[in-house]
């Protein structure tokens, strides 16, 4: 009798669990067309973080996925340079760009190895005043091998050559 009760319980349990399913949302177009590129034109990084660092923060128009990655490029005269990047000003002085991001925004920093208010006018104009950045959102599952240091190769691999540039507004 105990065996029949055990078998009956097992049978009922297996039948009841058959109806349990997990439904996951999968967006077919996620990897095709989700990549985005934003431009931050002529922005002055003017929010002081400390005596050595200024920053600027821009909100994404819509939150990005948790799994996405963000790349930031800085316009350097005639080409795009991948951030983070450092420049030697001479005499042991350095200036560096870096960034961080969340699902909701991207923040770009400019840091110096000395108090930033000691930059010459020429250095301030070259590295802080009216800087242009491009922010590229790369889907987290993107598997193609890309040379991320080359902006044009990155844009080409993501299929964004003809995509319109979206502009983000500086967070005040």
Where is each model-derived feature located?
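Intrinsically disordered, low-complexity segments enriched in polar/charged residues with Gly/Pro
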Residues: 1-2, 59
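First exposed extracellular module after export/assembly in secreted or surface-exposed proteins
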Residues: 28-172
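Basic side chains
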Residues: 2-3, 134
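Bacterial Sec-dependent N-terminal signal peptides
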Residues: 3-5, 14-39
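Active-/binding-site microenvironments in catalytic and ligand-binding cores
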Residues: 10
């Amino acid at each position: 009798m105990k065996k029949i009760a055990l078998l009956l319980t097992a049978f009922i349990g297996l039948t009841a669990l058959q109806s349990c399913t997990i439904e996951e949302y999968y967006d077919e177009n996620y990897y095709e067309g989700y990549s985005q590129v934003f431009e931050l034109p002529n922005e002055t990084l003017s929010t002081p973080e400390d005596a050595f660092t200024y920053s600027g923060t821009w909100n994404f128009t819509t939150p990005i996925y948790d799994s996405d990655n963000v790349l930031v490029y800085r316009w350097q005269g005639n080409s795009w340079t991948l951030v983070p990047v450092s420049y030697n000003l001479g005499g042991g002085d350095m200036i560096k760009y870096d960034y961080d991001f969340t699902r909701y925004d991207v923040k770009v920093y400019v840091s110096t190895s000395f108090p930033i208010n000691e930059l010459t006018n020429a250095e301030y104009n070259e590295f802080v005043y009216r800087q242009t950045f491009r922010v590229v959102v790369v889907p987290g599952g993107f598997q193609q091998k890309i040379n991320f240091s080359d902006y044009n190769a990155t844009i080409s691999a993501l299929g964004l050559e003809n995509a319109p540039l979206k502009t983000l507004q500086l967070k005040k």
